[in-house]
């Protein structure tokens, strides 16, 4: 198949792969945010928000050489009528590798395992989430939305790559921290009500901090209805308000409140 200096000419196989990935992305990730709480000694957290605007890059499509705009690629793909001629010479060199990783990405909520900072020399990437699938490990590079240091640690996924265990260690900066819990919500919802992943041991270790996060960012009624045993363990103390939580744990609650306050701004940034 012909190629130019930028990308390879798309064929039927590539178009069909993109259709399949887009339909899975629409079902599992588009319009969703995930709150990831992680850490061994100290619990930290970040939010990852997915939108249709992320799809083309994550799937290995060079938007500069595509014959239609990214939002048109996505719309036609989820409708099942994307054609090779729509894509032109937009198939990136690592397209096949990215499509393999993207299949695992669709199970993001239940397969993410670790979080780490990455080498600052890599353009604009300042966080990565390690994910273990049945056949591969990969990392999501993510841009921090907003420049204020005091703002919420919220990310938009920007890169996707398959990495060997050795490569993961080479690219990682500092400790790769295990994930304690992952919650999800639709972007039009204000609070988290679904638990996607749970590490029982870390949840027990960080119970006080986790309780403050869930009380601030979560829908307490919905969480209690869906996960009564877990919530009974976490909320067993008689908290009348967030002010009853220790000063240490309250820092996390305040950061969660900042996430809630800036959500509209964040989602506007993602839609551009």
What residues fall within each predicted segment?
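Compact beta-sheet-dominated globular domain cores
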Residues: 135-200
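An acidic, glycine-rich, mixed-charge low-complexity segment common to nucleic-acid enzymes
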Residues: 1-126, 130, 180-272
């Amino acid at each position: 198949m012909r190629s130019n200096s930028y990308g390879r000419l798309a064929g039927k196989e590539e178009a069909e792969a993109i259709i399949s990935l887009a339909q899975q992305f629409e079902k599992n990730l588009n319009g969703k945010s995930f709150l990831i709480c992680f850490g061994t000694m100290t619990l930290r957290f970040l939010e990852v928000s997915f939108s249709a605007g992320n799809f083309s890059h994550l799937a290995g499509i060079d938007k500069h050489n595509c014959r239609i705009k990214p939002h048109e690629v996505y719309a036609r793909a989820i409708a099942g009528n994307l054609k090779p001629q729509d894509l032109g010479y937009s198939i990136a060199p690592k397209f096949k590798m990215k499509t393999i990783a993207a299949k695992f990405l669709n199970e993001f909520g239940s397969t993410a395992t670790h979080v780490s900072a990455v080498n600052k020399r890599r353009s604009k990437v300042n966080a990565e989430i390690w994910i273990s699938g049945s056949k591969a490990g990969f990392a999501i590079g993510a841009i921090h939305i907003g420049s204020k240091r005091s703002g919420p640690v919220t990310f938009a996924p920007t890169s996707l790559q398959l990495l060997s265990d050795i490569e993961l260690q080479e690219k990682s900066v500092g400790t790769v921290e295990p994930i304690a819990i992952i919650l999800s919500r639709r972007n039009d919802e204000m609070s988290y009500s679904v638990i996607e992943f749970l590490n029982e041991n870390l949840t027990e270790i960080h119970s006080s901090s986790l309780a403050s996060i869930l009380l601030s960012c979560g829908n307490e009624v919905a969480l209690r209805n869906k996960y009564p045993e877990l919530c009974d363990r976490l909320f067993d103390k008689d908290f009348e308000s967030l002010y009853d939580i220790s000063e240490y744990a309250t820092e996390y609650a305040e950061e969660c409140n900042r996430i809630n306050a800036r959500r509209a701004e964040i989602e506007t940034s993602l839609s551009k």
